[in-house]
Amino acid sequence: MFNDLKGSKMNVLDRSKRRQAWRSSAACADPEISPDRRVFFPPNETQPGACEPAKSVCAQCPVAGDCLWLALVERAADGVFGGLASPERRHLLERTPGLAIALRVIYVADQLPEWITHQDMATMCIGAGSKQLRPVWAIRHPPSGDRVRGGRWIKDELMAWALNLVVGWTQGDDCPPPLADRVRHELARFPQTVVCA
């Protein structure tokens, strides 16, 4: 239900038409299917049945996987996105450490520059000021701020880490089917990256 979030406090990382074109295909964008957008933001999501009207719309949505992916990447605090309410999304991320970072890395992969600093990477992948990505970056480089030649190689290493985590996760029972399909489609963009078993 991202159509109502344009211009909100959420930090949408990639606003290109190619990336956001799926929104026009969303079931929630059709007033005949979803006349009242407020159903996607029930006052008490933990109350039994509160999210069922929204989930029924998501169940027939052709882009539910895209919606859920972006909600996980952006860590949407409220609402039903891609068929999952916010408590369900939080639980999903808590069960798989590193999943939010890996999904975000894949989401912004085509924006990662060749020349990159530790701070650039943290800003690009996680958001300015966040320390969540630093352990990943520190695999090869201590935090310094000096520009590193071969940032492309660093990008590939980061992508391999993200792909390994996400591929394993989508093959398990924990990944919602619409998101698994969407992630598999996205992974096809990276055939040159070797994913270890």
Predicted regions located by residue number:
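Immediate flanking context of iron-sulfur cluster ligation sites
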Residues: 12-27, 33-62, 73-76
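Polybasic, low-complexity binding patches
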Residues: 45, 49-52, 69-103
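Short, amphipathic alpha-helical "recognition" segments used to contact nucleic acids or chromatin
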Residues: 98-115
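Short alpha-helical "recognition helix" segments of helix-turn-helix
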Residues: 117-124
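Major-groove recognition helix of helix-turn-helix-like DNA-binding domains
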Residues: 129-143
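Short Lys/Arg-enriched helix C-cap and helix-to-coil transition segments
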Residues: 144-166, 174-175, 183, 196-197
